Amino acid sequence: MAIALLTGFQPSAQPVSGMDIIKEGKAACVIVIPAKPLPAERFAADELRYHLNRSGATDFQIVPEPVLASRHSLPKGRIYIGRCRATADAGISTERMRRFSGKIRQTGNRLFLVGRDEPGDVLKGLDFLGTWRKSAGTVIAVYDLLEKEFKIRWLWPGELGESIPVFRNFRLDETERVAVPKLRQSRLRLVNWGNAGWNNPDNAARFRQAQLRWLCRQRFCLEEDLSYGHGFKDYWNRFGKTHPEYFSMLPDGRRGLLPGGISGRAMLCVSNPALHHQILADHQAATAALPPSESEFAPQNVINLCENDSPALCTCPQCRAWDAPQASFATHPYWGKGVIPTLANRFPALGSNDGAGSDKGAPSLSDRMTRFYLTVQAAADKIKPGMVVFGYAYANYAAPPLRVKLNERVIISFVGWPFYPFTADRMAAARKDWDGWRAAGVRLVLRPNSMLVGHNLPVFYAVRLGNEYRHAWKHGMIGSDFDSLTGQWATQGPSLYTMGRLNSRPDLTVETILDEYYTAFGPAAAAVKDYFTHWEKVSDSMTDAHWQKVTGKLGRISFKNWLNAGNAMFPPEAMQEGRRLIKAALHAADSDIMATRRVAFLESGLTHAELTLAALTAQQKLQAQPSAVNRKAFAEALEKLRQFRRQAEADGIADMGYLFRYEKNGSGWWK
């Protein structure tokens, strides 16, 4: 527990126990680092000083441990970071700690922040997707302290999004705890399309670095790597000619690819024992040189059975015998009538949409796929007992099995959250599927594509997706892997913050998290809440029937061309009400400088959305009535949008590269 005294408040007496961090607006302690700090320890010290210097004192120092004795003018308090000698002398060891775990211990006038650290730069060590792989437990300890004791919140990337309370005095009670990841893996995939769409490459670089730091502060990290992708993308090239029996039998008796198919989409004949033998042989060859590991998720202890990116297709008698009986097999165009789709049409033709199962009269292939998982696992156990297998809940095997029971050594990557819209019925169906998989005995990794919606428009999904996340966390979730962080901070901020905050605090309610966000707007908090409540109502008003009309007119909508549906989602009257509410928020901010800056950030996002929709409207008018006048109007709308982005990109309101890519490829802009 911390006793924090806000500016202007003086207590009658201070408690005897504990340690002063800030006293009368001055640093009451010094930050101590090892003589030769690891990059993670240096990063942790820098992050701690950065935040403390904004919490009420500006004179916190970082001092190497060996020179402490010669610095007589330093404050008496000590905050030891990482592997200091004083930490070892205090009997604190990280040897048995989990990866990405940190210890916090305060006793007397000493505070120890230490964790399981590995060599390598923290931010530079994150991979292309923004994945934090190198353990930095000391950094985790620092963030845990800043969040829980100092009540610091990171609403969005950059200084403006840092909500840091200011104290005249701050005293920390004696405490000891360990901060550990809530999941064995957590990932919110970073979108990184380079500098296209940015006017200034330096702004692009700063934006990406700020997002990486935000991901770290929200503690997205890989204690274990549970992200197994499509596992058989090379099989057609390897075995298509020599072992065609490894692959799906199509309704016409051929084994192989769908019309227009490519090698990486070839689907397997999962009941074939020869295929099982090949999979195990490949696994043994790939892991033979690896030493034994106690981790259940080490590569040598895991077999990846995640099928390629297509629905299950095999019509051979053995695979069909593995299916649970369903009347829909006889009536379905593919299974009952032999209609073979093209590769491009494979998902809707087999009754699924971008990985999420549907109820369009298509049978579920989950019993077949789960028997595949169990059969290979049983064969692997004969070689090495206790093997873990990874599979998908995807496409036409997204629903839980009807008959097969599994075990906790089967890990299912669950893709089954709806893409859009997030109607109550769709979310209820997704929860039913999740609970069904858990009841079948598996553990799950949440792997949705749901956060790819919205382009730069004010889509609001914090409540519906946030509540489903909390349910998953309580019911068998051991990892997450979200696609993706699209970076639309000024229009989708509450939703992005909610999904980030839940990563480190899934115990918090969505309402509590949203209150954290709104409270940061000071006197404008209620008005900002009203503003986003409006967008929540607009977002939740989209019904399946309305969406089907939209897609019936525009064709299939995915994240690649979601903007094309923007005017149907956000009609003029909705945008006008949003403009009225943001003006009210600006007025409510009054003379509060920080509140005004933050509301202005949101207002810039709304202007950005308005200009984007104006360009879309001009394009749709041109498509309906091609003419020189309409062509000029569209060009002028695009230029106005371009000029706004050039002026606003340094403010970090949006990932301009993400928008440029899908406006160009999905909507035909910027040619």
Predicted regions and their residues:
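Acidic, contiguous N-terminal accessory segments
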Residues: 2-3, 9-99, 168-176
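Feature activates predominantly on carbohydrate-active enzymes
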Residues: 44-47, 51, 94-370, 381, ...
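Structural motif
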Residues: 33-37, 80-85, 114-117, 192, ...
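Structural recognition of the beta-strand scaffold that forms the well-ordered cores
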Residues: 30-32, 78-81, 112-114, 189-190, ...
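Short acidic, S/G/P-rich loop/turn micro-motifs used as interaction or catalytic elements
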Residues: 36-40, 85-88, 119-120, 310-312, ...
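Substrate-binding groove of N-acetylhexosamine-processing glycoside hydrolases
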Residues: 165-166, 178-179, 356-671
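Extracellular/periplasmic catalytic domains that process cell-envelope and extracellular macromolecules
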Residues: 23-25, 71-74, 104-107, 296-298, ...
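Short, internal active-site loops enriched in acidic
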Residues: 68, 308-313, 394-401
